[in-house]
Protein backbone atom coordinates (compact mmCIF):
# COMPACT_ATOMS: atom_id res chain seq x y z
CA UNK A 1 0.00 0.00 0.00
CA UNK A 2 1.37 3.38 -0.97
CA UNK A 3 2.09 5.97 1.68
CA UNK A 4 -0.58 8.39 2.59
CA UNK A 5 -0.46 11.59 0.58
CA UNK A 6 -1.01 14.67 2.71
CA UNK A 7 -1.88 18.05 1.27
CA UNK A 8 0.14 20.78 2.95
CA UNK A 9 0.29 24.43 1.93
CA UNK A 10 3.18 26.72 2.79
CA UNK A 11 2.49 30.06 4.47
CA UNK A 12 2.10 33.02 2.17
CA UNK A 13 5.24 34.88 3.26
CA UNK A 14 7.34 31.72 3.05
CA UNK A 15 5.97 30.90 -0.40
CA UNK A 16 6.69 34.44 -1.65
CA UNK A 17 10.27 34.28 -0.43
CA UNK A 18 10.87 30.89 -2.03
CA UNK A 19 9.31 32.01 -5.33
CA UNK A 20 11.51 35.13 -5.34
CA UNK A 21 14.64 33.04 -4.78
CA UNK A 22 13.69 30.59 -7.51
CA UNK A 23 12.92 33.43 -9.91
CA UNK A 24 16.31 35.01 -9.17
CA UNK A 25 18.01 31.69 -9.84
CA UNK A 26 16.16 31.36 -13.16
CA UNK A 27 17.14 34.90 -14.16
CA UNK A 28 20.80 34.25 -13.35
CA UNK A 29 20.68 31.04 -15.39
CA UNK A 30 19.16 32.93 -18.32
CA UNK A 31 21.90 35.59 -18.10
CA UNK A 32 24.56 32.90 -18.01
CA UNK A 33 22.99 31.22 -21.04
CA UNK A 34 23.03 34.49 -22.99
CA UNK A 35 26.68 35.04 -22.10
CA UNK A 36 27.56 31.53 -23.23
CA UNK A 37 25.70 31.98 -26.52
CA UNK A 38 27.49 35.29 -27.12
CA UNK A 39 30.91 33.79 -26.41
CA UNK A 40 30.03 30.80 -28.59
CA UNK A 41 29.19 33.08 -31.53
CA UNK A 42 32.46 34.95 -31.08
CA UNK A 43 34.43 31.70 -30.90
CA UNK A 44 32.79 30.33 -34.03
CA UNK A 45 33.52 33.56 -35.86
CA UNK A 46 37.17 33.38 -34.82
CA UNK A 47 37.50 29.71 -35.78
CA UNK A 48 36.20 30.28 -39.30
CA UNK A 49 38.64 30.29 -42.21
CA UNK A 50 39.73 33.87 -42.73
CA UNK A 51 39.80 35.05 -46.33
CA UNK A 52 40.57 38.59 -47.44
CA UNK A 53 37.79 40.47 -49.14
CA UNK A 54 38.05 39.99 -52.87
CA UNK A 55 37.85 42.96 -55.19
CA UNK A 56 34.74 42.92 -57.37
CA UNK A 57 35.35 41.68 -60.88
CA UNK A 58 35.18 44.39 -63.55
CA UNK A 59 31.92 44.52 -65.44
CA UNK A 60 32.27 44.05 -69.22
CA UNK A 61 32.01 47.20 -71.30
CA UNK A 62 29.19 45.75 -73.38
CA UNK A 63 26.95 45.76 -70.33
CA UNK A 64 27.83 49.35 -69.51
CA UNK A 65 27.02 50.50 -73.02
CA UNK A 66 23.54 48.98 -72.82
CA UNK A 67 21.87 50.77 -69.92
CA UNK A 68 18.78 49.31 -68.41
CA UNK A 69 15.41 50.89 -69.19
CA UNK A 70 15.17 52.16 -65.62
CA UNK A 71 18.39 54.22 -66.00
CA UNK A 72 17.71 55.58 -69.52
CA UNK A 73 17.70 59.42 -69.69
CA UNK A 74 14.46 61.13 -70.53
CA UNK A 75 13.88 63.37 -73.56
CA UNK A 76 13.89 66.51 -71.38
CA UNK A 77 17.33 65.61 -70.02
CA UNK A 78 18.64 65.07 -73.53
CA UNK A 79 17.31 68.47 -74.65
CA UNK A 80 18.88 70.25 -71.68
CA UNK A 81 22.19 68.50 -72.33
CA UNK A 82 22.11 69.52 -76.00
CA UNK A 83 21.38 73.17 -75.11
CA UNK A 84 24.21 73.17 -72.60
CA UNK A 85 26.62 71.76 -75.18
CA UNK A 86 25.63 74.40 -77.73
CA UNK A 87 26.11 77.18 -75.16
CA UNK A 88 29.57 75.90 -74.30
CA UNK A 89 30.57 75.68 -77.96
CA UNK A 90 29.34 79.23 -78.57
CA UNK A 91 31.30 80.53 -75.57
CA UNK A 92 34.45 78.83 -76.88
CA UNK A 93 33.99 80.39 -80.32
CA UNK A 94 33.48 83.85 -78.83
CA UNK A 95 36.58 83.52 -76.67
CA UNK A 96 38.66 82.34 -79.63
CA UNK A 97 37.45 85.29 -81.72
CA UNK A 98 38.30 87.81 -78.98
CA UNK A 99 41.79 86.37 -78.47
CA UNK A 100 42.53 86.26 -82.23
CA UNK A 101 41.32 89.85 -82.69
CA UNK A 102 43.55 91.06 -79.86
CA UNK A 103 46.58 89.34 -81.38
CA UNK A 104 45.89 90.85 -84.82
CA UNK A 105 45.54 94.35 -83.28
CA UNK A 106 48.83 94.09 -81.42
CA UNK A 107 50.93 92.57 -84.24
CA UNK A 108 50.66 95.49 -86.81
CA UNK A 109 51.52 98.03 -84.13
CA UNK A 110 54.62 96.07 -83.23
CA UNK A 111 55.81 95.77 -86.85
CA UNK A 112 55.02 99.38 -87.79
CA UNK A 113 56.85 100.86 -84.82
CA UNK A 114 59.78 98.56 -85.38
CA UNK A 115 59.98 99.68 -89.02
CA UNK A 116 59.74 103.35 -88.04
CA UNK A 117 62.53 103.03 -85.52
CA UNK A 118 64.65 101.20 -88.11
CA UNK A 119 64.09 103.90 -90.71
CA UNK A 120 64.95 106.65 -88.25
CA UNK A 121 68.14 104.90 -87.33
CA UNK A 122 69.10 104.44 -90.99
CA UNK A 123 68.52 108.14 -91.83
CA UNK A 124 71.43 109.25 -89.61
CA UNK A 125 74.75 109.28 -91.53
CA UNK A 126 76.98 106.88 -89.61
CA UNK A 127 80.22 105.22 -90.58
CA UNK A 128 79.96 101.46 -90.89
CA UNK A 129 81.61 100.38 -87.71
CA UNK A 130 81.16 97.74 -85.00
CA UNK A 131 80.07 100.24 -82.41
CA UNK A 132 77.41 101.69 -84.68
CA UNK A 133 75.82 98.31 -85.21
CA UNK A 134 75.66 97.79 -81.43
CA UNK A 135 73.97 101.16 -80.97
CA UNK A 136 71.51 100.31 -83.71
CA UNK A 137 70.64 96.98 -82.13
CA UNK A 138 70.18 98.61 -78.77
CA UNK A 139 67.84 101.28 -80.09
CA UNK A 140 65.77 98.78 -82.04
CA UNK A 141 65.35 96.63 -78.93
CA UNK A 142 64.19 99.57 -76.87
CA UNK A 143 61.74 100.52 -79.58
CA UNK A 144 60.27 97.05 -79.56
CA UNK A 145 59.92 97.14 -75.79
CA UNK A 146 58.04 100.41 -75.96
CA UNK A 147 55.84 99.04 -78.72
CA UNK A 148 54.83 95.99 -76.70
CA UNK A 149 53.70 97.96 -73.67
CA UNK A 150 50.16 96.86 -72.72
CA UNK A 151 47.37 99.34 -73.38
CA UNK A 152 45.18 100.79 -70.67
CA UNK A 153 42.32 98.54 -71.68
CA UNK A 154 44.10 95.53 -70.13
CA UNK A 155 44.93 96.41 -66.52
CA UNK A 156 46.02 92.87 -65.73
CA UNK A 157 49.14 93.30 -67.90
CA UNK A 158 51.40 95.68 -65.96
CA UNK A 159 54.83 96.99 -66.93
CA UNK A 160 57.53 94.52 -66.06
CA UNK A 161 61.23 95.02 -65.38
CA UNK A 162 63.41 96.52 -68.06
CA UNK A 163 65.38 93.33 -68.48
CA UNK A 164 62.40 91.41 -69.90
CA UNK A 165 62.62 90.60 -73.60
CA UNK A 166 60.10 91.16 -76.34
CA UNK A 167 59.34 87.52 -76.99
CA UNK A 168 58.64 86.89 -73.32
CA UNK A 169 56.08 89.70 -73.15
CA UNK A 170 54.50 88.60 -76.39
CA UNK A 171 54.20 85.03 -75.11
CA UNK A 172 52.59 86.21 -71.87
CA UNK A 173 50.04 88.24 -73.76
CA UNK A 174 49.17 85.53 -76.23
CA UNK A 175 48.78 82.84 -73.58
CA UNK A 176 46.80 84.94 -71.14
CA UNK A 177 43.54 83.28 -72.06
CA UNK A 178 44.91 79.74 -72.07
CA UNK A 179 43.55 78.37 -68.81
CA UNK A 180 40.10 79.85 -69.31
CA UNK A 181 39.98 78.45 -72.82
CA UNK A 182 40.95 75.00 -71.61
CA UNK A 183 38.36 75.17 -68.86
CA UNK A 184 35.67 76.02 -71.40
CA UNK A 185 36.75 73.24 -73.75
CA UNK A 186 36.46 70.54 -71.07
CA UNK A 187 33.61 68.20 -71.81
CA UNK A 188 31.11 67.28 -69.10
CA UNK A 189 32.15 63.64 -69.29
CA UNK A 190 35.66 64.43 -67.97
CA UNK A 191 34.23 65.52 -64.60
CA UNK A 192 33.01 62.00 -63.89
CA UNK A 193 36.16 60.19 -62.75
CA UNK A 194 36.10 56.72 -61.29
CA UNK A 195 37.70 56.10 -57.90
CA UNK A 196 40.59 53.69 -58.10
CA UNK A 197 40.34 50.67 -55.80
CA UNK A 198 43.20 50.14 -53.37
CA UNK A 199 44.21 46.51 -52.85
CA UNK A 200 46.51 45.82 -49.92
CA UNK A 201 47.99 42.77 -51.62
CA UNK A 202 48.96 44.68 -54.77
CA UNK A 203 49.75 48.18 -53.44
CA UNK A 204 50.65 47.43 -49.84
CA UNK A 205 54.27 48.35 -50.51
CA UNK A 206 53.21 51.93 -51.23
CA UNK A 207 52.05 52.45 -47.66
CA UNK A 208 54.42 54.24 -45.32
CA UNK A 209 54.48 54.22 -41.55
CA UNK A 210 54.51 57.49 -39.60
CA UNK A 211 57.85 59.02 -38.83
CA UNK A 212 57.86 57.95 -35.18
CA UNK A 213 57.11 54.36 -36.11
CA UNK A 214 59.78 54.34 -38.80
CA UNK A 215 62.34 55.59 -36.30
CA UNK A 216 61.28 52.92 -33.82
CA UNK A 217 61.49 50.21 -36.49
CA UNK A 218 64.96 51.29 -37.60
CA UNK A 219 66.17 51.47 -34.01
CA UNK A 220 64.72 48.04 -33.30
CA UNK A 221 66.38 46.59 -36.42
CA UNK A 222 69.74 48.00 -35.36
CA UNK A 223 69.36 46.56 -31.88
CA UNK A 224 68.47 43.12 -33.20
CA UNK A 225 71.43 43.25 -35.58
CA UNK A 226 73.70 43.97 -32.62
CA UNK A 227 72.07 41.11 -30.73
CA UNK A 228 72.71 38.66 -33.58
CA UNK A 229 76.31 39.77 -33.81
CA UNK A 230 76.66 39.28 -30.05
CA UNK A 231 75.21 35.77 -30.36
CA UNK A 232 77.75 34.74 -32.97
CA UNK A 233 80.71 35.99 -30.89
CA UNK A 234 79.74 34.47 -27.54
CA UNK A 235 83.04 32.95 -26.56
CA UNK A 236 84.36 35.03 -23.65
CA UNK A 237 82.88 36.16 -20.35
CA UNK A 238 83.26 39.78 -21.34
CA UNK A 239 81.10 39.18 -24.40
CA UNK A 240 78.45 37.47 -22.27
CA UNK A 241 78.43 40.37 -19.84
CA UNK A 242 78.15 42.83 -22.71
CA UNK A 243 75.28 40.84 -24.19
CA UNK A 244 73.46 40.75 -20.86
CA UNK A 245 73.87 44.48 -20.46
CA UNK A 246 72.72 45.03 -24.01
CA UNK A 247 69.60 42.89 -23.46
CA UNK A 248 68.81 44.87 -20.33
CA UNK A 249 69.13 48.13 -22.26
CA UNK A 250 66.98 46.69 -25.05
CA UNK A 251 64.22 45.80 -22.62
CA UNK A 252 64.39 49.21 -20.99
CA UNK A 253 64.30 50.99 -24.37
CA UNK A 254 61.41 48.95 -25.76
CA UNK A 255 59.41 49.23 -22.56
CA UNK A 256 58.69 45.48 -22.48
CA UNK A 257 60.18 44.95 -19.02
CA UNK A 258 57.77 45.17 -16.15
CA UNK A 259 58.00 48.16 -13.88
CA UNK A 260 59.67 47.24 -10.61
CA UNK A 261 58.57 49.55 -7.82
CA UNK A 262 61.16 51.17 -5.62
CA UNK A 263 61.31 50.93 -1.84
CA UNK A 264 59.36 54.15 -1.37
CA UNK A 265 56.62 52.97 -3.75
CA UNK A 266 56.39 49.65 -1.91
CA UNK A 267 56.05 51.47 1.40
CA UNK A 268 53.33 53.75 -0.03
CA UNK A 269 51.40 50.75 -1.37
CA UNK A 270 51.78 49.02 1.99
CA UNK A 271 50.29 52.01 3.80
CA UNK A 272 47.35 52.08 1.38
CA UNK A 273 46.77 48.36 1.88
CA UNK A 274 46.90 48.71 5.67
CA UNK A 275 44.26 51.42 5.53
CA UNK A 276 42.12 49.32 3.17
CA UNK A 277 42.37 46.29 5.45
CA UNK A 278 41.37 48.38 8.46
CA UNK A 279 38.31 49.69 6.62
CA UNK A 280 37.40 46.20 5.45
CA UNK A 281 37.67 44.85 9.00
CA UNK A 282 35.41 47.59 10.34
CA UNK A 283 32.83 47.05 7.61
CA UNK A 284 32.82 43.30 8.15
CA UNK A 285 32.33 43.71 11.90
CA UNK A 286 29.46 46.10 11.23
CA UNK A 287 27.76 43.68 8.85
CA UNK A 288 28.17 40.75 11.22
CA UNK A 289 26.81 42.73 14.15
CA UNK A 290 23.54 43.53 12.37
CA UNK A 291 20.80 40.98 13.04
CA UNK A 292 18.76 40.63 9.84
CA UNK A 293 15.02 40.97 10.34
CA UNK A 294 13.91 39.60 6.97
CA UNK A 295 15.33 37.54 4.18
CA UNK A 296 16.00 40.56 1.93
CA UNK A 297 18.22 42.20 4.53
CA UNK A 298 20.04 38.92 5.08
CA UNK A 299 20.54 38.52 1.35
CA UNK A 300 22.00 42.03 1.08
CA UNK A 301 24.30 41.26 3.98
CA UNK A 302 25.54 38.13 2.22
CA UNK A 303 26.17 40.08 -0.98
CA UNK A 304 28.14 42.68 0.97
CA UNK A 305 30.26 39.99 2.60
CA UNK A 306 30.96 38.41 -0.79
CA UNK A 307 32.07 41.78 -2.14
CA UNK A 308 34.34 42.29 0.86
CA UNK A 309 35.82 38.84 0.29
CA UNK A 310 36.59 39.74 -3.33
CA UNK A 311 38.30 42.97 -2.28
CA UNK A 312 40.35 41.07 0.30
CA UNK A 313 41.49 38.64 -2.39
CA UNK A 314 42.61 41.55 -4.57
CA UNK A 315 44.52 43.08 -1.65
CA UNK A 316 46.26 39.77 -0.97
CA UNK A 317 47.23 39.46 -4.62
CA UNK A 318 48.69 42.96 -4.54
CA UNK A 319 50.65 42.08 -1.40
CA UNK A 320 52.13 39.05 -3.14
CA UNK A 321 53.17 41.20 -6.12
CA UNK A 322 54.87 43.71 -3.82
CA UNK A 323 56.54 40.91 -1.89
CA UNK A 324 57.94 39.44 -5.12
CA UNK A 325 59.24 42.85 -6.19
CA UNK A 326 60.94 43.43 -2.85
CA UNK A 327 62.40 39.90 -2.93
CA UNK A 328 64.10 40.61 -6.28
CA UNK A 329 65.51 43.92 -5.08
CA UNK A 330 66.61 43.24 -1.49
CA UNK A 331 69.41 40.82 -0.46
CA UNK A 332 68.70 37.46 1.17
CA UNK A 333 69.19 38.62 4.75
CA UNK A 334 66.24 41.01 4.51
CA UNK A 335 63.74 38.45 3.16
CA UNK A 336 62.45 37.32 6.56
CA UNK A 337 61.69 40.88 7.63
CA UNK A 338 59.99 41.57 4.31
CA UNK A 339 57.75 38.51 4.62
CA UNK A 340 56.82 39.53 8.15
CA UNK A 341 55.87 43.04 7.04
CA UNK A 342 53.93 41.78 4.04
CA UNK A 343 52.02 39.20 6.09
CA UNK A 344 51.20 41.69 8.83
CA UNK A 345 49.50 44.15 6.47
CA UNK A 346 46.11 42.49 6.92
CA UNK A 347 46.88 41.11 10.37
CA UNK A 348 47.67 37.55 9.32
CA UNK A 349 49.54 35.29 6.94
CA UNK A 350 49.26 35.64 3.21
CA UNK A 351 47.19 32.82 1.79
CA UNK A 352 48.01 31.90 -1.77
CA UNK A 353 44.59 30.32 -2.26
CA UNK A 354 42.85 33.70 -1.94
CA UNK A 355 44.81 35.30 -4.76
CA UNK A 356 43.60 34.83 -8.33
CA UNK A 357 45.71 32.47 -10.41
CA UNK A 358 46.31 32.35 -14.11
CA UNK A 359 44.34 29.90 -16.22
CA UNK A 360 46.79 27.64 -18.06
CA UNK A 361 45.80 25.07 -20.66
CA UNK A 362 47.64 23.03 -23.27
CA UNK A 363 44.94 22.26 -25.85
CA UNK A 364 41.43 23.22 -26.85
CA UNK A 365 40.03 20.00 -25.32
CA UNK A 366 41.57 20.91 -21.99
CA UNK A 367 40.13 24.40 -22.25
CA UNK A 368 36.71 22.94 -23.02
CA UNK A 369 36.98 20.66 -19.99
CA UNK A 370 37.93 23.61 -17.80
CA UNK A 371 34.96 25.63 -19.04
CA UNK A 372 32.60 22.69 -18.41
CA UNK A 373 33.90 22.19 -14.89
CA UNK A 374 33.58 25.92 -14.23
CA UNK A 375 29.92 25.81 -15.27
CA UNK A 376 29.31 22.76 -13.09
CA UNK A 377 30.86 24.53 -10.11
CA UNK A 378 28.64 27.57 -10.70
CA UNK A 379 25.60 25.27 -10.88
CA UNK A 380 26.56 23.58 -7.61
CA UNK A 381 26.97 26.95 -5.92
CA UNK A 382 23.48 27.92 -7.10
CA UNK A 383 22.01 24.66 -5.81
CA UNK A 384 23.72 25.03 -2.45
CA UNK A 385 22.36 28.55 -2.11
CA UNK A 386 18.82 27.40 -2.91
CA UNK A 387 19.10 24.48 -0.48
CA UNK A 388 20.23 26.85 2.27
CA UNK A 389 17.23 29.08 1.63
CA UNK A 390 14.87 26.09 1.61
CA UNK A 391 16.42 24.78 4.79
CA UNK A 392 15.92 28.11 6.52
CA UNK A 393 12.26 28.18 5.43
CA UNK A 394 11.18 24.52 5.76
CA UNK A 395 12.90 23.31 8.92
CA UNK A 396 11.03 25.72 11.20
CA UNK A 397 7.75 24.51 9.67
CA UNK A 398 8.66 20.88 10.29
CA UNK A 399 9.55 21.60 13.89
CA UNK A 400 6.23 23.33 14.54
CA UNK A 401 4.13 20.43 13.24
CA UNK A 402 2.97 17.57 15.41
CA UNK A 403 5.09 14.51 14.61
CA UNK A 404 3.52 11.23 13.74
CA UNK A 405 0.69 12.33 11.50
CA UNK A 406 0.50 11.75 7.73
CA UNK A 407 0.89 15.46 6.90
CA UNK A 408 4.04 15.60 8.94
CA UNK A 409 5.47 12.52 7.17
CA UNK A 410 4.63 13.99 3.75
CA UNK A 411 6.26 17.27 4.74
CA UNK A 412 9.39 15.44 5.90
CA UNK A 413 9.59 13.51 2.64
CA UNK A 414 9.16 16.76 0.65
CA UNK A 415 11.86 18.49 2.69
CA UNK A 416 14.22 15.55 2.24
CA UNK A 417 13.57 15.49 -1.50
CA UNK A 418 14.24 19.21 -1.84
CA UNK A 419 17.22 19.44 0.49
CA UNK A 420 19.01 16.13 -0.09
CA UNK A 421 17.95 14.97 -3.53
CA UNK A 422 17.71 18.34 -5.26
CA UNK A 423 14.02 17.75 -6.00
CA UNK A 424 14.85 14.99 -8.49
CA UNK A 425 13.48 12.06 -6.45
CA UNK A 426 10.64 11.80 -3.95
CA UNK A 427 10.64 9.05 -1.35
CA UNK A 428 7.64 6.79 -0.95
CA UNK A 429 6.83 4.57 2.01
CA UNK A 430 5.43 1.07 1.57
CA UNK A 431 3.40 -0.15 4.53
CA UNK A 432 1.45 -3.42 4.72
CA UNK A 433 -1.49 -3.53 7.09
CA UNK A 434 -1.32 -6.52 9.45
CA UNK A 435 -3.70 -9.33 8.61
CA UNK A 436 -6.81 -9.54 10.72
From Swiss-Prot:
Keyword RNA-binding on entry: no
One of the GO BP terms on file: positive regulation of smoothened signaling pathway
Residue ranges with Low complexity bias: 111-131
Keyword list, A-Z: Cell projection, Cytoplasm, Cytoskeleton, Phosphoprotein
Superkingdom assignment: Eukaryota
InterPro entries given in the database record: DUF4693 (IPR031518)
PANTHER family linked: TUBULIN EPSILON AND DELTA COMPLEX PROTEIN 2 (PTHR14870:SF1)
Name of this protein: Tubulin epsilon and delta complex protein 2
Annotated organism of origin: Mus musculus
Gene: Tedc2
Amino acid sequence: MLGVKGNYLLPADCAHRLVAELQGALDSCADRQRQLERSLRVSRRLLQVWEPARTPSPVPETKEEDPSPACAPSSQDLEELELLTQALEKAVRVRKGVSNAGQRDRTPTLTSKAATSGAAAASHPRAPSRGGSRVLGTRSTKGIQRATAPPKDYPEHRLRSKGDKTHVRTQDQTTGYGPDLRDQQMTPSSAHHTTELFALKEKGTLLQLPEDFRKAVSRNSCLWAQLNSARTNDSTDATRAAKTQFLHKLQMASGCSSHRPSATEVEAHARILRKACMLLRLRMQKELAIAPTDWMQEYRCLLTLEGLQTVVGQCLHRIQVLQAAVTEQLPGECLAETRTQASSVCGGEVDSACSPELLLYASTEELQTLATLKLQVALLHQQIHLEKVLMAELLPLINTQDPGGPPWLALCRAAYSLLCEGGERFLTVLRDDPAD
